[in-house]
């Protein structure tokens, strides 16, 4: 598995909808091209009471998602990914009452 890119997204970069769908647009050209460090070398400053990983396979890609919330109850998360040449549209179906502080995304390819 090769880590292609990763990005930490703050709440400012997250758009929420009344249905509980969270849409995140990630520009691969801007975000992923400048990331040279391994995910372990970059630490998120946002405090979190819960850190959980959720994985989603999309074709040959594996999307690992770690949500940081301020609420402790378990999160039910489903993800779908649509990809263009420079932008990924990641849709997270999550309980919109949960407060998301930050999101950590890792993209790996076999």
From Swiss-Prot:
Lineage: Bacteria, Pseudomonadati, Pseudomonadota, Gammaproteobacteria, Enterobacterales
UniProt protein name: Protein ORFj in retron Ec67
Keywords: Transposable element
